[in-house]
Design a protein with these regions (language model features):
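Conserved polar catalytic motif of the HATPase_c/GHKL fold
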Residues: 53, 57
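Conserved beta-strand-loop-beta-strand hairpin that lines the nucleotide-binding pocket
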Residues: 1-12, 59-156
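Short, well-ordered amphipathic alpha-helices
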Residues: 32, 58-59
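Short secondary-structure capping/turn micro-motifs that flank functional sites
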Residues: 51-52, 136
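Bergerat-fold GHKL ATPase/HATPase_c domain
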Residues: 1-49
Length: 156
């Protein structure tokens, strides 16, 4: 992401969540509650789906070959979700502790998974990306959503 504002008008960061299959549902609830408080309900469905896909990717990336969380030094991996706005754009970030980079896979028609980043790409009009996190989690995947209206009381 380029050109982050010096200060966000509003932000909401969840506490770390265990990288479990339940994490995307909790992330969706956070998105819905935060956007309701910010009076941005027109973005609910899109942001909720994108964050859910990114959270699911973080959970999957944090799993071992058997699909269970890959504990490191006795600790469960975590993901974390943050929402930020400057009034013109909403940014959703999902951090995870998994190595590797997010890759659009281009699955076949018969594949049951692998479409998450394609969905994110389409719903954000390609306004998404990722970066390595300097401390703590291994990476952050972000997505931007333009805010279609300006409301001076939207973030109070």
């Amino acid at each position: 992401m380029s050109g982050r504002p010096a200060a966000w008008l509003a932000s909401s960061v969840m506490p770390p969540l265990g990288a479990l299959r339940t994490a995307p549902a909790i992330a969706r609830g956070h998105v819905r509650n935060t956007l309701a408080a910010w009076r941005l309900s027109e973005l609910w469905d899109t942001v909720e789906l994108v964050v859910s896909e990114l959270a699911a990717n973080g959970v999957n990336a944090s799993a071992g070959p058997d699909g269970r969380p890959a504990f490191h030094n006795g600790r469960m991996p975590v993901i974390q979700v943050g929402l930020f706005t400057d009034g013109a754009v909403l940014v959703a970030e999902v951090w995870d502790q998994a190595g590797g980079v997010p890759v659009r896979k281009g699955p076949g028609d018969a594949d049951e998974s692998g479409r998450g980043l394609d969905i994110v790409h389409e719903l954000t009009n390609a306004r998404w990306g990722w970066h390595h996190a300097p401390a703590g989690p291994a990476k952050c995947v972000w997505a931007e959503f333009p805010i279609s209206r300006a409301s001076p009381t939207a973030f109070i």
